[in-house]
Amino acid sequence: MCIRDSIIAPNDIGWTKSLGLLMLQIPDILNRFKPDIVLLAGDRAETFIFSIASFYSNYFIAHIQAGELSGHKDGMARHAIGKLAHIHLASNHDAKERLIRLGEPEFRIFQTGAPQLDDIVNGNIKSDSINVIKKQLRINLEKKFVLCIMHSSSDELKINSYVKLTYEALRRRGFFQVWILPNSDSGSEKISREILKLPKNELAVAQNFSRTNFIELLKNAELLIGNSSCGILEAPAVGLPSINLGIRQKGRIQAKSVFQILNPNLKNIDKSIEECL
């Protein structure tokens, strides 16, 4: 079941109604499979809905990457999921300590790391070659490129402007830009429109990639810029510098290769690009 398939409209009302429809489907799924444990990950709205349905259907819940900060409404959802979960799988010591401060019994908390990094660290990624991926995106094989991922953030009124600022800063430096359209959150349609309005020369737009091909893109990019959590997690794991714009990932533990800009403008984005490279 994919939440994107059930989206009524990518705005606040449509998104909320879609979550309601999802809630109606989950009890039947749980009744069909009768799991011993419902394993949930992260802070997505659909994960929160699944935790509510599982809790009130009397299923045991384990929560991956519990206790982290997200910097926007998903962070609130993460902590709400934590209150319904029975086992908390924290990715780092900071998250573990936060769970304790939130009142969770320490014997239920396990520091397990971020599982999405395991295949990267262990070298188990099998993807198409970067040249094959570049051809699919119509990128010159010799051209250096920057990966751009911008998701909606309900707490930031100017987030749509980050797209134009990022494009202009990279254009001035002559980088080919690979933009990945945002997830299905409320407000995503506005960001998608801004991305699709960008000039198409020296730029490629993709809906999504397989995880393996996405990791291969990260390994071969010059830089990642935007507000996706992959700039905090996967990018440092492959040695890629990243620039996080706005507050979406504010407060999370970050590697030294992550540059945080809380109030983006053309000048400080350009300065961060220079420092990254």
Describe the residue ranges of each PLM region.
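Active-site and donor-binding regions of nucleotide-sugar-utilizing enzymes
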Residues: 7-106
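A donor-sugar binding/catalytic signature common to diverse glycosyltransferases
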Residues: 39-41, 48, 88, 211-253
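Short acidic active-site motifs
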Residues: 76, 213-214, 268
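Short acidic-hydrophobic, aromatic-tinged amphipathic segments that line or gate anion-handling sites
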Residues: 90, 110-112, 204-208, 259-264
